């Protein structure tokens, strides 16, 4: 069913799909077939197959299987990062550095993207300072990642604070590296998309029927 879904989406002109995740099977068993799915996705013409990874181990597995793009995830919120990947934020950034360095030594390099989750707030610790997010943006930009996904993981963003943060992110990393991920928790998902479009960013990370 997963492979059938991927083929159908590619026919609808989606150029990039996050096809699977290389995460511990004991924690997220539904990705037990990650290797099979990635191998099949790589056969689809005109599709960039990206893979979510939480650590260096997962990244190495994905790169060994020729993942065209690595989506590494960390959180601006310390509490959320600890709950999600069992690390503090600095440790996650250090591990991202290891992934970038590992990828650079490969004969066939993949694109490295990092998602900064809880960029507008956290369900565990509440408000997340824009300064914290911008500090992370500076660090990951310096590491040489190809893309940065500013993610409103819990849907706390509004057009005002979205524009404020993205303007400063653009100053650090430029428009070409940046894309956005919004949730519609408070009915502001589309309004936030428009706010970012007005700044000249045209790439968004989305899901199908709320799944993904």
Language-model features: where?
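Alpha-helix-loop-beta-strand connector modules within alpha/beta enzyme cores
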Residues: 27-51, 91-113, 160-180
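Non-cysteine beta-strand/loop elements that form the S-adenosyl-L-methionine
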Residues: 68-77, 113-117, 200-207
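Glycine-rich, positively charged N-terminal anion/phosphate-binding segment
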Residues: 2-47, 53-61, 66
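Glycine-rich, proline-tolerant flexible connector loops at the mouths of alpha/beta enzymes
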Residues: 15-40, 73-88, 118-124, 149-160, ...
């Amino acid at each position: 069913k997963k492979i059938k879904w991927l083929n159908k989406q590619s026919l609808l002109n989606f150029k990039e799909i996050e096809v699977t995740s290389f995460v511990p099977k004991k924690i997220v068993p539904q990705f037990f077939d990650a290797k099979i799915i990635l191998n099949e996705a790589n056969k689809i013409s005109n599709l960039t197959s990206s893979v979510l990874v939480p650590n260096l181990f997962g990244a190495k597995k994905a790169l060994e299987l020729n993942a065209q793009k690595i989506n590494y995830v960390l959180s601006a919120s310390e509490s959320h990062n600890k709950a999600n990947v069992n690390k503090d934020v600095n440790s996650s950034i250090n591990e991202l550095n290891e992934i970038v360095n590992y990828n650079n030594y490969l004969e066939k390099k993949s694109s490295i993207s990092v998602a900064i989750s809880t960029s507008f707030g956290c369900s565990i610790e509440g408000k997340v300072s824009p300064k914290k997010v911008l500090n992370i943006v500076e660090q990951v930009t310096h590491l040489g990642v190809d893309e940065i996904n500013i993610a409103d993981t819990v849907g706390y963003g509004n057009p005002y604070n979205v524009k404020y943060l993205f303007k400063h992110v653009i100053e650090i990393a430029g428009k070409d590296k940046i894309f956005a991920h919004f949730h519609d928790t408070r009915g502001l998902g589309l309004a936030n998309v428009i706010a970012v479009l007005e700044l000249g960013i045209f790439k968004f990370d989305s899901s199908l029927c709320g799944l993904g």
